[in-house]
């Protein structure tokens, strides 16, 4: 281990090598053509980066920590002769490094089983229903939740199971409802159980999580690639809508932006912004507004739509609000607005099962017509998915 391990550029490595050969600031500056003050700043920056990882020999710090951690404190024990005989290193998560590692894992998930970047999928020659849109609604999926059946009384659930279940459900629904011009993959929020590597919700509530964050992000990247590619085989255009939930409001942002980057050169894929927790689209005379459903009651949902989407309301005659959060289906009609929450595919975790919560598990696809609003729908239950 040396300072060379903490250099990011050839210039930094050159300076460190000369410094380790015994050259001072002035001689190094003369040899490589920069000021002695620049040499000093380079070395201080490299030493600071190394010390943050636990490496600073001049301070008897030689026990390093992993790349995604920072040293919080070091306790060194010396003998009577003043020589170090033991050391205790305290570390803490480096959030910036964890984010960088997470993004690298996400990118790896995209490129898994792909030679190079995204390869366009051949569009269907025609679709039977140019005036229709198939909305594939993913209720709170809690992809990386951990549920153990002896404890919860329901099915097991982990990252691998969640991935397999969703791929099967979407495949069955696309096979049944894929003759529409547009397919909209709508994630109604809480796709991830935890918001970060702390294994907590955004509010700080600890949750039972399966898998390290990097692995989960890699799986999420690959999973959405598979789902959208499957939809592109049948629909001429695919929309991706990621609603931000209460479990994963920040994770949903990076998920959305990474998908936008991945499909940047695919004109058949449209990724909706999700900077706001409210997202909407118009399909002919149909208005659809989406929100996770957290921290807002039915009456407030209705008031928000009529107030904030007044122009869209005036242009349409069929208006819907889709939300998740409560893990089961409810339907309410209020003042010309149809409000509906959708079911989920995941079982309840230990906390919710102990509190008596649970519901029928399913995923739905709603067919919307430009002129007539909701035309029909398809649903696949968990038993059919697992069959």
Can you describe what each PLM-predicted range is?
Residues 121-141, 149-269:
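Core catalytic region of metal-dependent phosphoesterases/phosphodiesterases
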Residues 116-124, 169, 301-312:
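Short, motif-level signal for alpha-helix interfacial/capping segments enriched in acidic residues
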Residues 71-84, 225-242, 289, 319-324:
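N-terminal short leaders/motifs
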Residues 20, 165, 273:
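Short, glycine/acidic-rich beta->alpha junctions
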Residues 1-160, 178-179:
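Acidic, histidine-bearing metal-coordination/catalytic regions of metal-dependent phosphoesterases
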Residues 232, 259-277, 282-289, 294-387:
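Conserved beta-sheet core of the metallophosphoesterase superfamily
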Residues 23, 46, 204, 380-381:
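Peripheral, non-catalytic segments of secretory and membrane proteins
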């Amino acid at each position: 281990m040396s300072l060379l391990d903490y250099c990011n550029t050839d210039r930094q490595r050159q300076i460190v090598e000369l410094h380790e050969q015994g050259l001072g600031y002035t001689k190094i500056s003369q040899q490589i053509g920069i000021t002695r003050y620049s040499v000093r700043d380079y070395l201080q920056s490299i030493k600071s980066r190394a010390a943050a990882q636990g490496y600073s020999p001049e301070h008897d710090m030689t026990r390093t920590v992993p790349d995604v951690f920072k040293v919080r404190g070091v306790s060194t024990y010396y003998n009577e002769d003043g020589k170090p005989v033991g050391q205790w290193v305290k570390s803490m998560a480096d959030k910036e490094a964890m984010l960088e590692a997470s993004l690298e894992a996400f990118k790896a998930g995209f490129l898994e089983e792909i030679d190079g970047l995204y390869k366009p999928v051949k569009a269907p020659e025609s679709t039977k229903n140019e005036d229709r849109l198939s909305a594939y609604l993913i209720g709170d999926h809690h992809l990386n939740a951990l549920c153990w059946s002896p404890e919860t009384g329901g099915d097991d659930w982990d990252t691998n199971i969640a991935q397999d279940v969703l791929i099967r459900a979407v495949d069955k629904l696309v096979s049944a409802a894929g003759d529409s011009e547009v397919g909209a993959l709508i994630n109604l929020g809480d796709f991830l159980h935890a918001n970060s590597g702390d294994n907590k919700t955004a509010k700080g509530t600890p949750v039972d999580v399966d898998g390290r964050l990097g692995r989960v992000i890699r799986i999420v990247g690959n999973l959405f690639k598979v789902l959208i590619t499957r939809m592109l085989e049948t629909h001429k255009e695919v929309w991706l809508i990621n609603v931000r939930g209460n479990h994963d409001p920040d994770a949903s942002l990076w998920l959305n932006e990474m998908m936008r980057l991945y499909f940047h050169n695919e004109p058949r894929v449209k990724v909706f912004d999700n900077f706001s927790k409210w997202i909407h689209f118009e399909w002919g005379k149909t208005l659809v507004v989406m929100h996770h459903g957290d921290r807002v009651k039915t009456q407030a949902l209705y008031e928000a739509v009529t107030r904030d989407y007044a122009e869209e309301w005036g242009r349409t005659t069929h208006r819907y609000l889709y939300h998740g959060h409560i893990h089961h289906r409810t339907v309410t009609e209020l003042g010309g607005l149809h409000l509906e929450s959708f079911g989920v595919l995941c079982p309840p975790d230990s906390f919710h099962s102990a509190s008596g919560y649970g519901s029928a598990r399913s995923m739905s696809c709603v067919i919307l017509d430009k002129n007539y609003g909701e035309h029909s729908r398809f649903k696949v239950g968990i038993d059919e998915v697992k069959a």
